[in-house]
C-alpha cells in the first residue's frame, strides 16, 4: 500500500505567502524558507540528508545512540512533526515509542513516506517473534537501495526542492551503497559456511543473514523488540545452541547493555568472545558509527574478524 499522500497547495496562495515572508524577514535561506522533512530514526535521517543536501531542513527525531524501539520525543518536536512537509519513517513496527505521534500527524494530513513499503519485508527468523515482520532492513544494503529508489521521486516532487540536485546526489549515494554491498559480499565470502553463525543480544540481522547466507542461531532478548526480557530457560536454550553450533563470537548492540551477553558467553562451554556492533542507531561523530556507510563497514569488519577461522 502506498502511504504517501501529497499535500496540494494553491499556487496563488503560495506565491502570496512567499512575498509576505520576504518582506517580513528581508532575507532568504533560513530554515523557515526550506521544506521540512521529519525523519523517525537516525539511520533513515542520514540517508535522507545524503539525498537532499541543503535544499531541505531534515529533522531527525531519534538521538544518536538511542533505542529505536523505545525513544520518545518532546512536545515541541511533536508539534513540528505535525507541521512537516513530509515524514519519513520505517513503518514496520520499529518506532514503538513514536507511533502515536506519527498517527497524529497522519490524521492532520501530513504527507508520509514509509520505507517499509519499498522493502521486500522478511519475517523474523525466530519462532519467539510469532511470525512478525522484521523492521531491520538496513542490514542489507540492497534493501536500502530499494528505499532510496522509491524515496527519490517523492523528494523531487516536493515544493521548494531542486529535482536536479536530488537526482545528482541520489545517483552518487546509490553508487556508494552499491560499493558497500560489494565490499560486504567480499568480506563475508572469506568466512567458511560452517562458521557463518550469528548470535546477538537482539534479533537484528535477519536481512543480513538472508542476503549473505548466514545462520541466525539465536538472540539473548526474545521476540522482535528490545522491550522484551529473556527467561532462565530462554538463556539455557541459547547456551545449548551456541555450544552445538560452535559459535566463536557473540555480537552485542552498542545501544543496549551487554551484561546478559557477557553472562551468556561465560556460561557457554566453549571459548566465546563478545564484540560490540552498531546495528540500530548511529553514534555521535566521535562514536565510531556517525553515518550509515561507516556503521555498515565497521560491522562488516567486526563480523568477518569475529567469525574468521582461528
Report each predicted region and the residues it spans.
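Extracytoplasmic metal-acquisition and chelation regions
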Residues: 2-13, 24-310
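Hydrophobic core
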Residues: 18-23
